[in-house]
Amino acid sequence: MVIKFKSNHFRDIMRICGPITSTCPDDREICRYISLVFYYDVCEAYGSNGHQISKVEVPCILKNVYPRFTLLIPPLKVPPRTREVEIHVDEKEKEYELMYLDEESDVIGAYKYKFFEGEPLDYESFYIKAQENFDKYNNGEGKYVISVNPKYLISALEGLKSCDSVIINFGSAVEPFLIRSGDESVKTSALLYPVRMT
């Protein structure tokens, strides 16, 4: 099996899914690695630390890859000169080789990884439930759709990082919402205004 990505698509996977994977060696593999699920020239990539899940869909080229094939890869830094990323899967040896190629298709980096036992079926059910929730909200089934500037959301949450939990109070889709500490000993809050959706 061969899987090919343009470098910008593979970088998107690492940028979106990599930062939220767990760095704790005692966590399950599904929380320490990025899951790639392949469907007919589309890759759904998921990253999770057990408390949140990020997902991105990118195009890819598949050769001899069956639908719903799942592969776990570590968060990686992509070399700057990379133009294409190839993954060669050897199911017999239960390993894969990830290669970074430059403009002339010369290999500028290659790394081999072993499969985890139970891959992919043990991991598939975890993301099936997540996908149901992504679909539900993407289809407008959420109670409110609120658009916020991500910089303001991040800075609002930055001040609450020391709290064990936060409580988010919504009024309506056009009213500001309140993010406050769920910890009684720390009385802090932030009010965030929505931005207009076009």
Identify the function of each model-found stretch:
Residues 1-198:
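DNA polymerase processivity clamps
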